Amino acid sequence: VKDMQVQRGAGTSTNGAGAFGASVNMQTEGASMKPYAEFNGSYGSFNTHKETVKVGTGLLNNHWTFDARLSNIGTDGYIDRASVDLNSYYLQGGYFAENTSVKLIAFAGKEKTYHAWGYATKKEMEDFGRRYNPCGEMYTDANGNKHFYDDQTDNYLQKNYQLLFNHTFSTAWNLNVALHYTKGDGYYEEYKDGRSLIEYGLKPFTIDGTEITKSDLVRQKKMDNKFGGGVFYINYTVNRLNASLGGGLNQYRGNNFGKVPWVKNYVGTLSPDHEYYRNKSQKTDGNIYLKANYDLTSGLSAYADLQYRHIDYTIDGNNDKYDWSKNALRPLAVDKKFDFFNPKVGLNWNITSNHRVYASFSVAQKEPTRNNYTDGDPDSYPKAEKLLDYEAGYTFANQWLTAGANFYYMDYTDQLVLTGALNDIGEALTENVPDSYRMGIEIMLGIKPCKWFQNRPTLVR
């Protein structure tokens, strides 16, 4: 990542179709015009280390560049057994002409992380130390020593491909098109003790005349997902007008399923690929927007951003949660369509070279996430959220001082808020609240008394 920007409020259409609240815009590394080779390494506590190798050809034949990077990050972890092993690569090839550029990018990452989401209690930390990790605990032997499951890990591999096209038609017109595809495969594995066999589609078995309905077992929750699509925008700039027409069409397809590779003392035939739940998802997301900034007079400008977005979202199959009232896995039958119109307008007035005031109004709407559906009540699926964002502010800037205040009022309908509950891997659960709001003031101050020192504190109330 070359650059990362965080924008408060309702994000602009350029930064993503689903911008709701603050948005993050990340820019990948640009091509280097000069050849280079670089190695970076670091080492710290708990065997924490990072190694990166970067090489690049520079500009070849006045048109071509190629860049590559390999990296590894690892640690034993402060928490017991909370080890991490991360590996990634980045490849980039580019063609550059006077008015056109084409870049092909491929990058991937692989991770293996031992679970540390079990949240040790205060009593456990008093008994076993602050670094105690209950995840993967199997049993305590006769000497009082706890034994843990070695493969209590999260494993994921993701591959990404991007094709970026840029063309400048004239001083007024330019076009950007990006195609992308992502393939992900992963699973997490965990040891579970005393689990009911029926939850996993397994029949009770008999040992020495005793029927066994619960047993220790190992389960894997897996995912296989694909995400692809394209985005574009065409920009027009002339005199006092800067306008863009853009949009995108993307589709996500995913399979989530669970397997039980081992059951303690199991009597009977247990397939190594015994599957106990499966569901598939498909989400098609299309959007189009028109945005413009116009200089009304010297120092005074107005902007508008009008976006329409449509989503088709389906999830079909069984959840991984067992419904004891019905003696069956919870079904998933989501078939939702969303249509959102998200307008944004604003004014900016540079009173002088030092003083600036601004005001804006934005609408942002967002569909529930997959977790909102799978962790929620199957008889009452969550609703889409809507935000009306009102903001106004003032900034002052000169050579050594910047200061400003931003007032905001955010009016929500059906906001998904934290309930305080957690799901089985420690993620926070949410539910819709019919009406809610946030309001406050952000005070910013920047001091730069000399070239080599600056300080930028921020106060939010």
What are these regions (language model features)?
Residues 1-38:
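A beta-strand signature from Gram-negative outer-membrane beta-barrel systems
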Residues 41-47, 59, 72-76, 97-99, ...:
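Transmembrane beta-strands of outer-membrane beta-barrel pores
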Residues 42-50, 71-96, 136-166, 215-229, ...:
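Outer-membrane beta-barrel proteins
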Residues 63-66, 99-104, 172-175, 240-243, ...:
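Repeated loop/turn-to-beta-strand initiation elements of outer-membrane beta-barrel proteins
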Residues 94, 101-162, 189-216:
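Acidic/polar loop-and-plug regions of large Gram-negative outer-membrane beta-barrel proteins
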Residues 98, 248-250, 276-412, 448:
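Structural signature of Gram-negative outer-membrane beta-barrels, strongest in the C-terminal barrel
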Residues 298, 409-411, 431-461:
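Gram-negative outer-membrane beta-barrel transporters
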